[in-house]
């Protein structure tokens, strides 16, 4: 473990757009999928960090599946573990959220924009929240 790594429990790999959140016992790994959505790659026993966890994305052609791209019959939101699935994106499982927009549409599409890793936990003004005394 390199100096200061015990404090840094979130690692981001820019090239693969992968986040690795971990503690002594567990790892939670998510990535930015090729369509900009967040995909959940792994949650379980602690894994050693590596720059590329893309082998955890299950991509294969399946019959009777809706595909995002005509040229890629292996990428389907219906079969990928998404971090926050929404209604109307070719994933027919229950969405995490379904919004009724002013124009009557219920289709939403949230895409990854950016990230910021900060030390500690910001205070939530006027709201109850957990806190840490060590700044970790």
For each feature predicted by the language model, list its residue ranges.
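N-terminal accessory beta-strand-rich subdomains and adjacent acidic, glycine-rich linkers
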Residues: 3-136
């Amino acid at each position: 473990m390199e100096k200061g790594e015990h404090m840094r429990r979130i690692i981001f790999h820019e090239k693969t757009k992968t986040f690795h959140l971990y503690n002594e016992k567990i790892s939670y790994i998510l990535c930015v999928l090729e369509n900009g959505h967040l995909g959940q790659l792994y949650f379980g026993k602690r894994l050693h960090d590596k720059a590329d966890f893309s082998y955890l994305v299950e991509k294969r052609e399946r019959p009777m599946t809706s595909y995002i791209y005509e040229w890629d019959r292996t990428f389907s939101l219906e079969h990928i573990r998404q971090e926050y699935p929404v209604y109307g994106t070719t994933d027919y499982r229950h969405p995490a959220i379904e919004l009724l927009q002013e124009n009557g549409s219920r289709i939403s599409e949230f895409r990854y924009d950016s990230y910021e890793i900060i030390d500690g936990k910001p205070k939530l003004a006027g709201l109850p929240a957990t806190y840490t005394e060590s700044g970790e």
